[in-house]
Amino acid sequence: MSSQGKQYEYLDHTADIKFQAYGKTREEVFENAALAMFNVIIDTKKISGDTAREIFLKSPDLESLLVDWLSELLYLFEVDEIVFREFRVDNIREENGEYSITAQALGEKYDLKSLPFETEIKAVTYNQLEITKTADGWKAQVVVDI
């Protein structure tokens, strides 16, 4: 992790929600970006991890892979009604000009009565999107449309 040991932090944005996620590896920064996004929706500490989803995605570049990863998790929340609390990215590979991610997301079936959500996220955007290698590892900046 980097930026004084933080997993992520929220930044000021006029209309949407912007955050930066940190990690020692690309895999860790993707995990922490997912955690930051789900903590916008709900307090992830209140969620059990009894439901798992395997995720495999391919994208033309690392930035698109991050957007696709977060968008897939948001899709699973909206369609399968699963809220996630933990993310395990096994690997991110670059091969033949494409990036791929193999990961697992752990959470539980969403129940509005016991788990009221805080903020609805409409979409993950490319606005101000950045993924950079830093002296401490990796940093990703993401803006989500609310």
From Swiss-Prot:
It comes from the Archaea. GO terms for biological process: tRNA splicing, via endonucleolytic cleavage and ligation. Coiled coil: none annotated. InterPro entries: Archease, Archease_arc, Archease_dom, Archease_dom_sf. One of its GO terms (molecular function) is calcium ion binding. PANTHER family: ARCHEASE, PROTEIN ARCHEASE. This is Protein archease. It comes from Methanosarcina barkeri (strain Fusaro / DSM 804).
